[in-house]
Amino acid sequence: MANNMNFVRVVANHNSQPSRHIYIKAPVTMAQTVRGADAAGNQNQNAGKGGVETTQLVGGQRPGAARKANRMLLGLLEDSARYDMKSDYSLPDTWLRKRRATAQKTAKAEDKSVDTKKTRAAGKKTKPSEAGPDAKARSGMTSAPSSSSTDAAAPAATGKARNGKARAASSVTRNTVLANASPFASPSEDVIELQHQFFRITDHQDCVNREITSSLLLTPKDVADQQIVRLHFILYPDVSEEYKVTFGHPNNGVFNPIHEIGKCIKYAVEIYFPKTFKKKGSKLLQQLSKAYASMNQSAFVEAVEQYNDLVRAIPQDQVNEHLQQTKKIPRAFIHDILQMAYSRCVLPNVNGLKEYRSFSNFVYGELLPTFLSTVYQQCDLKPGQIFIDLGSGVGNCVVQASLEYGCALSFGCEIMKNASALAKSQLKELEERCALWGVDLKPIEFSLRKSFIDNERVNELLPQCDVLLINNFIFDTKLNQAVEKLIQGLKPGCKIITLKNLRPSGYTINFDDVENILNRLKVEKFTLPEDSVSWTYRGGGEYFISTVQADIDESVFHSYAKGRVRGMRPAKYTK
């Protein structure tokens, strides 16, 4: 009891104010007080004799537990000084008590883990002997003793044979994986219906003079067994692009010429070939896939040459007539055209994008094509509408909205110098390639090296905007407030895509500012799928689609929209 009294006396003498004022008004003083209390507790423990004094409870707890609780409290106080719920719309994780998984969920997770282990163990087992001698004869296997001691006593001389079998097995596995991963082995499944004029055949002489970035700049130099192959365009057989092909080093981690050749031939057969030539094109694709699966470089090059001969033999008027009747195309065709321009203009200069300052408004990140197709579809983006991207980076979102949905205008604004330069070069490359593929690219406009704040062109277009994209994942408070002012003039029906909610947590209507657009937003939250953004492959994040309404949204009046519900039973949380 003496230790307890000494402890209380030290705290009281350190600061004459009540303890509740210490906690609220002076966290630094609180830290000093706790340190003083710890020191006093240590002195009292040293003064005691025997084991009885050292185990004396302090304030109903052991001294170690009290110090631990004080450190946790200090951590919370320091954390609270960094966050302001009103301005940053978030709380630190240490303020949120996480629910424990229920017993049912825990049991299911354990069962799933056991099943996974069993599956892995079963995958390592050989085929059972009940398959019969015929199966063993076909596979070239001989019966082996099942005794583990016999396996352990196998002579070391068989190591070479085993290694040889392992190498052969790994070679077969690699070929199987390549065959399964063939970009041109199976027909495209995700098909979209064209709601606008997608194809436009331009003057032949104009396309002959088109300048595209060569793929040779993306492939390594002086590689053994490397062959240069020409691939002719289906609409303009006089125009071709060169590729370096080698199965020894098919992929340098950035660009795979073999994949791109196969995809170009696949799309030409699926989309551009008239019905009378479809059968020949399908056989050619099978030949190409077989050469790819067997890693036969000469057979692959021969198949490409046969494709070039077939392209020259197809009458161009039949191709043009077939395109006029085409109403569906694979969505992957659009994504791959975008990738062709991106890989030649952005990837070689991607290091310039790393100059962005971390944890600032100028951190660079990309939304990937598959996610953009999904979110544009959720926003019901249509031909003839206006799409705007504020903070457009290298322009990926802008060009995809134009190419995939045929917007009347796709507009992007970017302030950073390097990203602006890449956006300009990527747009030029895309225009050249779309012309060679006969694709009608709708109007695209950029406001480069300029902020979207106090931007005359942005202010002019926003009232007409139908779909607005703002990647506000790392915007600070000041920029979020500027965005709130900027979007006040959006028309009813406009969709706003964001990675952070425009309306802060616990937002309720301010009757002194009833006309604020935040009162008229209908906010929908969605889970971010895997491979949606460039900065992480994991999913599980959130994105929001807010629809501007003509009237005030009812949710801003509801009690659950408040940050703290009063007069209601508090929610129960597990410890």
Swiss-Prot record:
How activity is controlled: the entry says: Ubiquitination of histone H2B to form H2BK123ub1 is required for efficient DOT1 methyltransferase activity on histone H3.
User: Could you tell me the EC number(s) of this protein?
Assistant: 2.1.1.360
What Gene Ontology terms describe where this protein resides (cellular component)? chromosome, telomeric region; nucleosome; nucleus
Q: Where in the cell is it found?
A: Nucleus
Q: Which domain of life is it from?
A: Eukaryota
- Residues where S-adenosyl-L-methionine binds: 364-367, 387-396, 414, 451-452
Residue ranges for the region (Disordered) are 40-65, 102-172
Record PROSITE patterns: DOT1
Instruction: Name the keywords, alphabetized.
Output: Chromatin regulator, Methyltransferase, Nucleus, Repeat, S-adenosyl-L-methionine, Transcription, Transcription regulation, Transferase
**What is this enzyme's catalytic activity, as reactions?**
L-lysyl(79)-[histone H3] + 3 S-adenosyl-L-methionine = N(6),N(6),N(6)-trimethyl-L-lysyl(79)-[histone H3] + 3 S-adenosyl-L-homocysteine + 3 H(+)
Comp. bias intervals (Low complexity) = 142-158
* Residue ranges of domain DOT1 in the record: 243-561
Q: Name one Pfam family in it.
A: DOT1
Q: What biological process terms from GO does the record include?
A: DNA damage checkpoint signaling; DNA repair; global genome nucleotide-excision repair; meiotic recombination checkpoint signaling; methylation; mitotic G1 DNA damage checkpoint signaling; mitotic intra-S DNA damage checkpoint signaling; negative regulation of heterochromatin formation
Q: Where is the composition biased (Basic and acidic residues)?
A: 107-118
Provide a Gene Ontology MF annotation, just one.
Answer: histone binding
Give the family per the record: Belongs to the class I-like SAM-binding methyltransferase superfamily. DOT1 family.
- Extra info from the record? In contrast to other lysine histone methyltransferases, it does not contain a SET domain, suggesting the existence of another mechanism for methylation of lysine residues of histones.
What does this protein's UniProt record list under function?
Answer: Histone methyltransferase that specifically trimethylates histone H3 to form H3K79me3. This methylation is required for telomere silencing and for the pachytene checkpoint during the meiotic cell cycle by allowing the recruitment of RAD9 to double strand breaks. Nucleosomes are preferred as substrate compared to free histone.
Task: Identify this protein by name.
Answer: Histone-lysine N-methyltransferase, H3 lysine-79 specific
Q: Which organism is it from?
A: Eremothecium gossypii (strain ATCC 10895 / CBS 109.51 / FGSC 9923 / NRRL Y-1056) (Yeast)
Name the gene. Answer: DOT1
